Regions:
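Short, flexible active-site-adjacent loop segments at beta-strand->alpha-helix junctions, enriched
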Residues: 14, 19, 81-83, 124, ...
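Short, active-site-adjacent cap segments at secondary-structure transitions
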Residues: 52-54, 84, 157
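Glycine/proline-rich, positively charged
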Residues: 24, 36, 86-173
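Conserved beta-strand positions
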Residues: 15, 48, 79, 117-120, ...
Length: 173
């Protein structure tokens, strides 16, 4: 199935790490078994977020994928940014600082050079839309993500981001 107007194709079902890896399931063998069944069943899309078990979801799921020896180019990996990762005032939201620092930490935890999709996990009313769009555009242009998108944004918020990106020569969600 095609993702939006991009050329990226994903399985109809994805395997996500929310409330699972690092929380209800912590045993790496069990995680590897789940990931193996998913991959053998045709799932190529593996979804995460930095805040899932404070980074453990990213670590454990991708460790299982590495252990299974699935070539990176056969996978579609995503992660998200927004929620607090610590008590630090800047370690949350969609500021340029948080977006750029979080992608690097996610890539390190996931043991990969890039994610296929990097999502704004929620809308951040405290950050100017231009800052958000420019930061995500920079992540894509730097090769750390191939696409960026949104999660739980309104249609109006997405339309604003797309219009701003087009008007500014930036990468749109």
């Amino acid at each position: 199935r095609q993702v939006g107007k991009s050329g990226l194709k994903v399985s109809s079902v994805s395997l996500g790490a929310w409330t699972t890896y690092g929380e209800s399931v912590q045993d790496q063998k069990r995680i590897a078994d789940i990931v193996k069944v998913a991959a053998e069943g045709g799932i190529n899309f593996f979804d995460n977020a930095d805040m899932y078990a404070r980074g453990q979801g990213e670590r454990l799921m991708t460790a299982a994928l590495h252990d299974l020896g699935i070539p990176r180019h056969h996978l579609v990996l995503s992660t998200k940014v927004f929620w607090p990762m610590s008590d630090d005032v800047n370690d949350r939201g969609l500021s340029r600082k948080h977006i750029l620092e979080s992608i690097d930490m996610s890539l390190e935890r996931m043991q990969t050079d890039y994610v296929d999709m990097y999502f704004a996990h929620r809308y951040d009313p405290d950050v100017p839309m231009g800052e958000i769009v420019e930061a995500f555009s920079d992540v894509v242009r730097s090769g750390r993500a191939l696409y960026w998108g949104t999660s739980e944004w309104s249609a109006a918020q997405i339309a604003e981001a797309v219009a701003l990106a087009k008007a500014s020569g930036l990468v749109a969600p």
